[in-house]
Design a protein with these regions (language model features):
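General marker for long, soluble alpha-helical cores
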Residues: 1-191
Length: 191
């Protein structure tokens, strides 16, 4: 069975989950769940494989995998967010929020990779990320400024609206990551 194969060969679990996600998306969650039960160590690989094969399923599958193996998934969230954002920028903000819900401490890293892969979604992703982890405002701002400077002003505005107390951290994070962008950012925030 697929579960037995997943137990024996963790790489197979990712391939099976990806194949099902592509061929029969409605069955992907059940299959991924049984594969991860058979081999919890493969949880992150399963989630990453599904993200590549069927980006629109990545958030739900990753949440399921986080319930099975939270430690492995905590380390995989930025990679999954990057994969989905690259495949479909329209999903970038949603996947950023979903991944930060799994590992709030990765909010800065997620901002960095999503901004790099889908700069047009960077500001919206930043807003989703600060909802998941308001304390990471500076790190989120830095990630956007470093990878998508053209989105920095919009992102800063969204971040300050979400967490006004973090305004200094937001501008500071952006200034550290991209000094050239910070004048525009400060100006936008004062408007």
């Amino acid at each position: 069975t697929a579960a037995a194969l997943a137990e024996a060969v963790p790489q197979a679990a990712g391939m099976i989950a990806a194949g099902v996600a592509e061929a029969a998306p409605e069955a992907a969650a059940d299959v991924a769940g049984s594969l991860a039960e058979a081999n919890p160590a493969a949880a992150a690989l399963i989630a990453t494989s599904v993200a590549q094969a069927a980006p629109e399923l990545a958030g739900d599958i990753a949440a399921d995998m986080a319930a099975v193996n939270p430690e492995a998934m905590a380390g995989a969230v930025a990679n999954i967010a990057a994969t989905v954002a690259a495949a479909d920028p329209d999903l970038a903000a949603d996947i950023a929020g979903d991944m930060a819900a799994i590992n709030p401490n990765a909010a800065g890293a997620i901002a960095n990779v999503v901004s790099a892969q889908a700069p047009e979604a960077a500001a919206e992703a930043a807003a989703a990320l600060i909802q998941a982890n308001p304390d990471a405002a500076g790190a989120i701002a830095a990630g956007v400024a470093a990878q998508a400077p053209e989105a920095a002003a919009d992102a800063a505005t969204a971040l300050v609206e979400a967490n006004p107390d973090a305004a200094a951290a937001i501008v500071g994070g952006m200034a550290n990551a991209n000094p050239d962008a910070v004048a525009d950012v400060a100006g936008a925030m004062m408007e």
